[in-house]
Every structure is written in structure tokens, then in C-alpha cells.
Amino acid sequence: MMQTGTIHNRDKFLQTVANRLGRHQRTSGVSRPHWRHQPQWTVFQGYSQDELLEALKAQCPRIHTQCVETTAVELKETLKEVVAKHGGGPIVTWDDPRFDEYGLTRLLRNEWPNENVDVHIWDASAGRKNIDYAEQANVGITFSDITLAESGTVVLFSGNGKGRTVSFLPKTYIAIIAKSTIVPRMTQAAAYIHEQIEKGHLIPSCINFITGPSNSADIEMNLVVGVHGPMKATYIVVTDR
């Protein structure tokens, strides 16, 4: 359960705001408004998971991202092919139980190292060294916790073994996406996060919304890829998960 912290000087701060507005501070009778029009819920409304996947695939070329479909059984070979296509290691990954659930542990800990492919699995006890590994890595690999079909965005919940820099510092980023994680858009992701907070569940202090490789553009619409993050990105969708 999420622990409630102590808020200091809240009443004083709110009273200052109320004074500036020229009214008394409201301490009761405040309710969340109900908006008559809520178009955010109608985007891809009623879509099946297959239809959401097609929407995600259609968006990927627009965000300069390759999308590859595979199955849980074929995931290991698919991942090996994608990594090789991007130039191989060094590789950095999260310390995530899903790698074991998807049959990738042997690849990370044995097969690639035996082929002289350097693999670093995030180690919370190593501190800054993890960031150094990520900085030198050619490929970073994580799972997507929620995937937004409309924008082609993967949502990552950072944590003790799930450092932000795994998806940020390597030249290439690979996201493994379970098809079941695909939702229409940001609306559903925000609703899920809000629901977890309402239930008192612990929410990561860092939640990242990543839409393909790093893209930067100036006022003249000159696009530069890779300035603030990976130069390339690939989404591997596991269609039977």
C-alpha cells in the first residue's frame, strides 16, 4: 500500500492563493466537474486487440520506428535477429522477471556472453556503474508496461532494477511489447495510473512515455534524430501474450 506523506504549509499556501483571488479559502463543497463532452474516450473505441495492433503498426513508420511481430516461442530468435541487424552489443537490459517469463534469461546470461556479446543486466547495487554501462551500450532492451496505439508510445514504469537510462542512452532501443498491453491512447494509461493511486498502490516515481527514437526539430521543421536519446528504435510485439 502507498504511504501517505506529510504536507507542510499547505493551508498557508492555499490561503495566499485565495487572498490573491479575493475570496475565502474553500475547504468543503468542492467536487470534480463532469465534462459533457469527453472525446478522449472515443478514439479507437470498441477496437479489438488485433485492431489496436494494426493501429500501432500504422503509426510506427510515422515515428521512424520498426515494428516486428513474433510469438512467445519465437521471441528469442526474433530478438537475436533484431539485435544483430542493429550491430550487436554491447547490450544493457532491465533486471525484469519478464525476461525469464518469456524465455530470454539463457540468451542474456549464457548465449550472448559465450558469443562475446557483452550484456549488462541492471544491478541496483552497482549505482552509477549502471549508467556508465548504458552510456557505452549499442542496444538497450526493456518491456513495455502499457502501449499506446494512437501515438506509437511505450510506457515504462521505472523501478529498482529498471533504470531510466536503459531506454535513453544506448544508440538503439528495443521495446518488447505484449499485445495485451496495447490500449487506444494516453487516456487509458492515465486512467490506469490514477486507478492504482486511488487503490493506494505504490506507483513508480518515474514513468516514461517514449515514442520511437529521439526526434528534435527546429522552427524550420528540420528533423534531427538521436540528439536527446536513441537514434533507432524497434518494437517487437509478442502477439500471443
Swiss-Prot record:
Pfam families: LUD_dom. It comes from the Bacteria. Gene3D superfamilies: NagB/RpiA/CoA transferase-like. InterPro entries: FTHF_cligase-like_sf, LUD_dom, LutC, NagB/RpiA_transferase-like. One of its GO terms (biological process) is lactate metabolic process. Belongs to the LutC/YkgG family. Is involved in L-lactate degradation and allows cells to grow with lactate as the sole carbon source. PANTHER family: LACTATE UTILIZATION PROTEIN C. This is Lactate utilization protein C. It comes from Geobacillus sp. (strain WCH70). The lineage of its organism: Bacteria, Bacillati, Bacillota, Bacilli, Bacillales.
